[in-house]
Amino acid sequence: MEYPNIRSLREDHDFRQCDLASVLHVSQNTYSQYENGVIALTAERLVKLADFYNVSIDYLLGRTDNPEVNRN
């Protein structure tokens, strides 16, 4: 599965892959595989990333260009 925005979010915030790997409690190699679409993120890890960046899961999945979380 592809996650078109997780690499750009990481780079925009000047994080390294190992920084995000630590947040998700995975290896840097595993995180790299997420960014490259080799393996799928679990729902729990998608939520962690969305909360970490304060963006919607739909934004992480590339289903919207709007990163804002709809809290209605």
Task: Name these PLM-found stretches.
Residues 4-23, 48:
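Short basic helix-loop element that most often maps to the first helix and adjoining turn
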Residues 25, 44-59:
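DNA major-groove recognition helix of helix-turn-helix/homeodomain DNA-binding modules
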Residues 12, 61-72:
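Short, charged recognition helix plus adjacent turn
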Residues 35, 53, 61-64:
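DNA major-groove recognition helix of helix-turn-helix
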Residues 25-40:
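Recognition helix of helix-turn-helix/homeodomain-like DNA-binding domains
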